[in-house]
Structures are given as C-alpha cells and as structure tokens.
Amino acid sequence: MSNTYQWLWKSNSNPWQTNIEEQWEKYSDIEMTIIENGYQNKYSHVELDNFIIDFKHLVQINKADSTKQRPIKRISDISLQCSREERFTLPSHNSLNTRRKSFGDEARWMSPKFIEEWIKRNPRITLTQRIEKAAQGILEEGRLLGKIVESQWLAEQLFEVKEKSWDEIALRCLFLYTRECFLYKLLNKALREEDLSKVDTLGPFCDFLWNSLSSENLKSKYQFTGLVYRSASLELDEIDAYKNSIKKNPKEWLGFSSTSKNRALAEIYDGNTLFIINVPSQSQHLDISTISNFPVEEEVLLGASTSFQIEHVKYDETTRKHHIYLRILW
C-alpha cells in the first residue's frame, strides 16, 4: 500500500517561536507507517527509536529529555513527489568509505559471492528457519545502528509470512526492500564492498531477495522488458573505464540496482551521468512498481551481480550529462 499521507515534525531551532517561517521535516518511511498505524488505531502515543509521538497534543517528545518537544502534523499527500535520490543513483565517492569501482569485471553469471557464502554456512535449513534467521539478522543490524524500532517493524513483517508460501515470502521481501530505511542501503553497501562480515546477518534476506527475482510465478506477473534509467555521479576515470569497455567483455553491478521506467524522474537527480539500460525479454528483473510503497517511482529492480554489455558512451550537451548505454545480459 502506498503512502497517501505524510507525517512531519517542526524543525525550526525554536519550534515554538511564532511569526517566523515554519520549517518542517518528514519522518522516515517506516516511522511514518508506525505513526499512521497508531493514529488510525486511536492510540494515545507510539514509540520511535528516539522519540515518543503524543497524538493528544500532537508533539514529538525526546526520550532522553522529555522537556525537548516539537510540534508534529499530518498532511495528505495525494501527489507524492519522488525524493529518494540515494535509491536511484550510484553512490558517489564521498559517500563511500573505500575506493570503489563503478562495475565489477567478473560477470560471473551466477549468484553473488555473498549469497554463496551464506549457503555454504547454512547447507541444510528449512524455509521457516531461513525466515527466522533473516529477521534475527535484521534485528541485530538495527541494534548496531540504533534503529531498534525500525528493525523490529521489519522483522515483524517477515514473521507474518513465516508459514506462508514461497511466493508470498518473496513478495514480502521485495516490499520490504522498497521501504526507505537502513535495510536496502546496508545490504547494497555490503554487496558492493563484498563485505563477508555481514553474511550471517544480511545473507538470509539477500538470498530471499535475489531468488525472488527468478520466481516463475512472479516473473509471469512482473517481468519487465524495455528501457530503464539510473543516475550516477561518476569520476572521469570511471567514465573512461566504461568507454574503454565498449563492446568488450561483460561487466556486472555487484549490488541490487533500482532503476526507473520514467526517464524524467531519473534525470532530475544531481549527477553527471545517466545510464540508459536495455532490459531484454527473458531477463530476471522485475517491475516492482505495484509492489513498492512508492509506485510513482516506476521502479524496476535489477538483481545483484547483474551482467551487462556496455554499448555506447556519449556526452549530451543539452543535459550536460554523460549517457552510458547498457544492454542487460542476465
């Protein structure tokens, strides 16, 4: 179900001062879900990681200091504008702790090393046990990040489908991946950096998500063929790497990649590069816009370790962006 509302908190340095321009900030996606659920169920309050939301007085109360309070408000959001730039762009150098390459050279045509390592560590495990491990792993990562309430919500969503069919579990994992929270960011960071220290906590969810893209039932409903778009801020040496690889050996993106069917949406983001990606028929990539909490984004999800051929690279004088044309191979 997509958001048709927004919850905001007043962010002025003095939130109670009058006769000034009001400044409001949105809560995170999952925080808004928790708040809206409490509002609809007429709770007196709900608890977030750092705050108590008081519905009677419409205030946010700091858990560490109850004297620190801010007004909150609920607004309808019929024409939600997509603002999740981080999801639809390749991370810049400044956002990464380590030197990164824009693509991997192996194009291994198989599941990511991250998943292979998790399977190796868990050779005989039932579907129910995998769900439990996925939920426990998310709870542990949430604890490390101080996102306990957020991770509890995610874990509860998984536990709800513990006894369901594989397809229902796959749909739930895809839905959770679309939520604006720490999960998709942390998972992709681990995949891009091939950080095997996260295998035990994120491996089971990653395995569910990766295999959901190859589910025959889901492919029959959501498989996508056509052009999709993704933005990026690339260094000149990275752009040169794409140029030098035109029509050569296949490359791969190590993480899951969110792309959009809407070119205009991808072009609004800051960045010097636009990927124009041809997704052929029979590929393992799904149009998850109707599954997503943000259908306006028109998201097509490319699986981790997606292999592609670099077809063409050019600079567009009108948009002042480098256009990199890719053809998905698998």
Which residues fall in each region the model found?
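Intrinsically disordered, low-complexity acidic/polar segments
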Residues: 69, 238, 286, 319-320
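Structural signal for hydrophobic/aromatic residues that build the beta-strand cores
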Residues: 7-9, 58-60, 229, 262, ...
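Flexible, small-/acidic-enriched active-site or ligand-binding loops
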Residues: 282-304
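Eukaryote-biased intrinsically disordered, low-complexity acidic regions enriched in Ser/Thr/Pro
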Residues: 1-136
